[in-house]
């Protein structure tokens, strides 16, 4: 967050993450959020343990609030980042992991206008997002 960066400065490269307070989703992240804790492991040699965290939460909104409050550094999906939030991307040259998204509905509704319009809207929005 901007609060964190004003207080501690931004990491310049992945090695700087070794000295940053990291916030993680926790050990039981759902499969849809696989690799959400990638700041703990990026750049870490395979024989080393993941970076330590100062806080683990069990939902993505809690992760957002902790990062936003300047508690530490963590990973959020793009769709949670809005211009009105005091967040700042760090290490922009590094792409985080991506996540698959599924739109599930009853087969008998496949050809309805309502489902088609909503599907088109979701596809348009999802193309803008990354995790």
Where are these regions (language model features)?
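A bilobed periplasmic-binding-protein/Venus flytrap-type ligand-binding module shared by bacterial periplasmic
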Residues: 101-111
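C-terminal regulatory
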Residues: 1-101, 127-131
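A cross-family signal for key residues in well-ordered alpha-helices
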Residues: 64, 105, 119
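Short amphipathic alpha-helical coupling segments at ligand-binding clamshell hinges
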Residues: 110-124
């Amino acid at each position: 967050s901007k609060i964190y960066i004003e207080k501690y400065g931004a990491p310049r490269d992945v090695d700087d993450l070794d000295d940053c307070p990291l916030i993680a989703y926790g050990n039981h992240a759902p499969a849809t959020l696989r690799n959400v804790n990638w700041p703990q492991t990026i750049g870490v040699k395979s024989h080393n343990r993941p970076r330590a965290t100062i806080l683990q939460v069990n939902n993505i909104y809690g992760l957002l609030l902790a990062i936003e409050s300047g508690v530490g550094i963590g990973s959020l999906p793009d769709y949670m980042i809005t211009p009105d939030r005091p967040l700042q991307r760090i290490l922009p040259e590094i792409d985080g992991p991506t996540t698959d998204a599924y739109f599930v509905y009853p087969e008998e509704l496949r050809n309805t206008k309502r489902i088609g319009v909503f599907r088109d809207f979701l596809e348009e929005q999802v193309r803008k997002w990354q995790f």
